Every structure is written in structure tokens, then in C-alpha cells.
């Protein structure tokens, strides 16, 4: 009996910094990051090419910094540096799982991580390495969601997988409304008209214009990433 082939060959996984905290109030929870890497390792060993964009909200949020009197651009650069720290932690955990990870930063910190160069990133993916994109887009005023959309389009990912703590997009907040139901799929226009806030407006527009589908799923749900990659009904698909 033949094993089913993955539905996706190349994916862009967007992880929030907050997802790395686990139940902690701040920073990186080692057990959480190890568990996430186990999920990533499973799909990588199925032959899926995986690129990751990581946020920095567990260490520093540029938006929050800007709101308390700090210059917004400075705060955003600090947020970008936070994503580099997260990317290094993620790559370290991947190395310990037997994966080969490469961190590529949108801002130059050559002694620590290599700069983002698109052909090099594509080469790494073809070689079966996991590429972790750090420092967002390298520009202030752009979120790591936008970086995920941008890098996803650049590397020719088949889908952007937005990993959250909820298993999809709901009609209302499932924690507050017991009648809330999960959308299995939505068009970009439907998601916009319902103001569901799946990604920020810039990221969402980029995905829509490039016809790059988004799937929202729970990273805390064991096996969810594999089910998404296999094309099963997991999370919520947003498509053109």
C-alpha cells in the first residue's frame, strides 16, 4: 500500500513570537519550541520544503514600543532584532532534532546570521534544509505577517500557514461565544467583507494579489501541521 503524498511541496509557516512563550509570560519556553520543531521535522521528513517566518512579540513588540513614546521606526528595529533571537533559538532546536536549519536575516548581522538572498534561500529549500527568515521585511512599519506574505510569494510557496493558538477562523471568539463555528474555507473577499482580521491589511492584500492561499491552524494542536500539509480539513483556508 502506497503512502499518500503531501498536498503541498513547499510551505511558508508563520509563527508568532507569542507562540514560543508557551504558558510563560515572556521569552522562549524550551519545551514549547521543541514540540513545535518536532511537528516541523515530521513534515520535512515527508519531503515537504519548509520556510519559517518568526515574530518577536514574546521579547519586544514594535507597535507597543511606539505607543509609549518611543520612535516607531526605532521600536520596529528592536522588534526585528527580537525575531533574530527567536530564529536562532528555533534553528538551535531544529539542529538538535537532526534538521539542518539556515537563518536568513533581512538586516545585516553577518557574524550571527547570514543575510537574506533569495537564490540562496531557494537553494537551501531544494536541498531539504529548513530556512528561517528573521528580521521581518527589514523595514519599519511592516509586520512579520507582511514578511510572511512577501517571503511566501518570493520563494513560490504554495500556501502561507498562519500558526495560532486557535484551530482556525471562527464566526466569533470561541472563548466568549459557545455558538461560534469554524469556517472551513473563505474567499479573500469574504474574509475582507467580514473583517475577520486574519492577517494585517498589507499582508492580506499581498496574498490576495498574488493568489497565495492562507491557512490558519492551531500550532498547539498535536499533528495539525501534518494534517494541513496532507490536505486534510484542518483549520481555515482563505483562497482567491
Curated annotation (Swiss-Prot):
Classification via CDD domains: AAK_UMPK-PyrH-Ec
Residue sites binding ATP per the record: 14-17, 57, 61, 164, 170, 173
GO CC terms of this entry: cytosol
Keyword vocabulary terms for this entry: ATP-binding, Cytoplasm, Kinase, Nucleotide-binding, Pyrimidine biosynthesis, Transferase
UniProt subcellular location: Cytoplasm
Chief site of localization: cytoplasm
Reaction equations catalysed: UMP + ATP = UDP + ADP
Subunit structure: Homohexamer.
Name this protein carries in UniProt: Uridylate kinase
Designated gene of the protein: pyrH
Amino acid at each position: 500500500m502506497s503512502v499518500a503524498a503531501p498536498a503541498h511541496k513547499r510551505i511558508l509557516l508563520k509563527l508568532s513570537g507569542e507562540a514560543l512563550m508557551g504558558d510563560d509570560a515572556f521569552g522562549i519556553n524550551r519545551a514549547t519550541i521543541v514540540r513545535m520543531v518536532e511537528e516541523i521535522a515530521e513534515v520535512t521528513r515527508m519531503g515537504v520544503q519548509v520556510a519559517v517566518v518568526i515574530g518577536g512579540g514574546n521579547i519586544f513588540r514594535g507597535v507597543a514600543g511606539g505607543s509609549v513614546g518611543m520612535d516607531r521606526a526605532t521600536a520596529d528595529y528592536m522588534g526585528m532584532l527580537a525575531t533574530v533571537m527567536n530564529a536562532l533559538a528555533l534553528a538551535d532546536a531544529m539542529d538538535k532534532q537532526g534538521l539542518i536549519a539556515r537563518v536568513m536575516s533581512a538586516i545585516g548581522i553577518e557574524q550571527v546570521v547570514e543575510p537574506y538572498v533569495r537564490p540562496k534561500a531557494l537553494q537551501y529549500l531544494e536541498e531539504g534544509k529548513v530556512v528561517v527568515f528573521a528580521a521581518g521585511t527589514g523595514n519599519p512599519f511592516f509586520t512579520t505577517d507582511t514578511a510572511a506574505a512577501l517571503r511566501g510569494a518570493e520563494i513560490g510557496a504554495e500556501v502561507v500557514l498562519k500558526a495560532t493558538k486557535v484551530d482556525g477562523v471562527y464566526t466569533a471568539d470561541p472563548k466568549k461565544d459557545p455558538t461560534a463555528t469554524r469556517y472551513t474555507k473563505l474567499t479573500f473577499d469574504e474574509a475582507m467583507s467580514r473583517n475577520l482580521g486574519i492577517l494585517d491589511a498589507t499582508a492580506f492584500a499581498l496574498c490576495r494579489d498574488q493568489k497565495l492561499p492562507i491557512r490558519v491552524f492551531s500550532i498547539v494542536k498535536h499533528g495539525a501541521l501534518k494534517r494541513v500539509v496532507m490536505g486534510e480539513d484542518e483549520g481555515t483556508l482563505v483562497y482567491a
